[in-house]
Each structure stands twice: as C-alpha cells, then as structure tokens.
Amino acid sequence: MPDTIAAIATASAAAAVGIVRLSGAETRCVLAALFTPVDGRSAAELPPRRMTYGTVRDAEGRTLDHALAVVFSAGHSYTGEESAELHCHGSPVVLQEVLRAAFAAGARQARAGEFTERAFLNGKMDLTEAEAVIDLIDAETAEAARNAAAQVDGALRRPLEQVYDALLSLTSRFYAVVDYPDEDIEDLTLAETERTLTESEQTLAALLGTFARGRVLKSGAATAIVGAPNAGKSSLLNALVGYDRAIVTDLPGTTRDTVEEKAVVGGVLLRLIDTAGIRETDDAVERLGVERSRRAVESADLVIVVADGSHTPLTVEPDILALAARAPHWILAISKDDRNPAVKTAVWRLPDGAPVPEHLVSFNSVMPGGLDALIDTIGDCFPAGVPAGGTLLTNARQAEAVDRALNAVRAAHEALTAGLTPDVVLTEAEGALDALGELTGRTAREDMVTRIFERFCVGK
C-alpha cells in the first residue's frame, strides 16, 4: 500500500492563501493529528468535498494557524487516493511549520510530481494528460494555456485511443485468422482492413502535422533579429521586451554576441535573439559574433531583417536577405520611421535578384504605437487557434511516438496493398500499437515515466 505523502502545493512566496496537500491511505489519520474542526469533531469524520474551518496544531499542541480543511474520498480525488488539503494563511514560514507537523504525524515529503504520478498510476489520467498538467502550469500565453487545458480534458488522448482501439481490433482478428485457419471465424475483408489503416494513417498524420505550431506555442518561436550594424536591432529587442536588455549606442558593432530574451508579442511567445550586425570584419571577436548570427538565422522560426530607414536609399545586404528567406517566416522591417516618415509610403527597391520578403513593414522603437504594425505582422506569421475539435502536439516525445506509429501504419498499409502475407501486416500494426502504448502510458517504461514526472514541481 502506498504511503501517505505531503507537500506545499502553492508558490514559496507570501500570499493570502497557501495550501498543504496530503494523499494516501492514512490521510485522514494524519489530518486528524493536525487539524481540529471548530465544532470539535474529529477531522477523520469530515464529510468529503466540504470546507471545514478549524485550528492547525503541532504534536505539542501549539497553534500553527487557523485554516480550512477539505477531504476527498478515494476514487474521487485528483490522485485517486484518500486526499486532503489544508488552506492556510500564505506565509512560507507557517506552511513549512504545518508541513513539518504533517511529517511528525506520519506523512512523508512528496517527490516532484508525485501527486500527478499517483493519478496516472491509479488510472485517473494517461501520460498525455499528465504532461498537459505541467504544460498548463508552465503556459506563458493564453493560447498555450487553452491547448494544455484541452489536453488535460483528453483532447489528445481521445484520438489516440480511437486509433489504438481500431488497430487492436484489427490485429486481434488477424491473429484469429492466422492462428486458427480451420475455425469458423469471420474473415477480415480487404476493404475493412484498408479503411482501418487509412483512417488511422489520416488521424496520426493530422496530429503530427500540428507539432511545428505546437512547439512554437509551448517553447516560443525562435526569432532572429538581423541586419547591418547600427540598423536598430538592439533598440527593437529592448522595445519588444520592455526594458534595456541590449546595449544601444551610435557606434556600429556594439553587439558582438547574440543576446536572447523571451517576450509575448501580439499574443505569440517569442524567443528573441538580437544578433551581431552581419558584415565583413577584420575584428576576430566581431567575426565570431557574425558567425553566431548566421547560425541563429539558420535555426530560426522567424527572421526579422532590420534595415535603417533614417536615410535613403535603403541599404540591405543581398546575402542577409537570402539567408532570411530560408526561414519559415521572415519580415523586412524598415527602422527609424520617426526620423524619416516617408518610409511609410515609399516604394523600396531591393537589390537585383534579392528574394521578395514575406512581409514588409516600417517601425520605430521610440514613439507611442511605433511598433504596432510590426507586432500585428508578427501575429500574422503565427495565427492563433487549433484545428477544429482538436489539439496541438507540443513536445518532442509525443511527436516522436506519433511519427513511429504513423510510419508503422503506413508500412502495414503498403504490405497490404502489395499483397504480402498477413503476418507482415500484423508485425507493422503491432509496431504502431507499441508506439501508441508508449505515448499514452499503457506500455511505457518505468524509467521514462519517472523522467516525465521529475519535470514537475513538488506539490503537483
């Protein structure tokens, strides 16, 4: 029988309310040793799901706090076990004292993620839903929170279960036909098998196709800000993050290394990378910075090419444009339009042979509203929303497992089309089942499950 665990479930900072959680078979006994309801009842007799006011005391009878307690019955709690919460005043000192009293009463310190791990082990959620819990906690945008909340509610589990159940039914019937050829067993028709594999392939391909957007949603779009020295790149970074993150001077070449910072811009989480100005240089240190700039562009989801608009003609190096054009999205942003308002309506001539930018916009980093057009353009590059009734894959583990399942289903489909023997189709279909089982936790290895829950905070 699992032991009873305890942890502080709220942030370690002063607040109006702080929560200590308990879970395990001896939860009511531990709670009764700590908490006395105001009406004199034993805490072991509290009705489930109802807040009760009372006093929290340590083993010596000293009052630690006046708090609210609530208990949850096994099978009807987050973990699936007997559980309880003490809602105390949010002093970190008070919460630590209450936690120590819980330990003295027989509970032990919960490991990171152990409450959610118990929920998984007790069948309250699968691995995709458990991972969505930490995604919800870590969400940095409203859209990321909505996607995670939908997955906690089963938005990813449901389509995976449908594919798993369809393939399991298919393989079990295949086994019956292969193992008992003389028995009176209804044969699988080619059309039925074809339909199951086709529908499974379509569902998995659609899910895998969401990973590029999901990765950006969760981790942020790698956004390289590039251009010639002194074009206004660092000023743009500072304006987007809201404080002076990068040094800005009138001297070209001030930024000699990449400077990174996260910011939510137009509802999109960006991992902004201010780069050294790209130019030919004899300075060894600056040359290293330029090389890092090129690498940042090559791995970026979005490239913002900043061109100095304070004077004409516009000067943009063709190799910078060519480099930016390889990115999934890129914007040619004309800076300093407060100094030269004509740039907002000017017709700019790019160097001969230069790629046409996906978006062209002017901006300035000093005037109110000077970034509005650029912010709107960034939002256009990463439209919000998820597929109707669906969700986005957001982590590499899930995407890799879906990819393996998809490849196995395709291989089974190809074997069927080629007229190969049923055992070949079976082998590939079972490979898909293995990948899906690992994804949802049906057949996941213990060490992999442990790594997943180690990412959680203590108390969740």
Explain the meaning of each model-derived region.
Residues 1-146, 150, 154, 324-326, ...:
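A glycine-rich (often HGG/GG-containing) alpha/beta subdomain
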Residues 2-12, 54, 142-264, 281-283, ...:
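C-terminal-of-GTPase-core extension/linker across diverse P-loop GTPases
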Residues 22-23, 88-90, 240, 275, ...:
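Glycine-rich, N-terminal phosphate-binding loop of Rossmann-like dinucleotide-binding domains
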Residues 52-65, 69-73, 253-281, 299-302:
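Switch I (G2) and immediately adjacent beta-strands of P-loop GTPase domains
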Residues 108, 269-271, 359:
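Conserved beta-strand segments of alpha/beta enzyme cores
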Residues 123, 230, 274:
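Conserved G/P- and acidic residue-centered "switch" motifs that form tight phosphate/ATP-binding loops
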Residues 272, 306, 333:
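Generic enzyme active-site microenvironment
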Residues 286-310:
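Inter-motif core of Ras-like GTPase G domains
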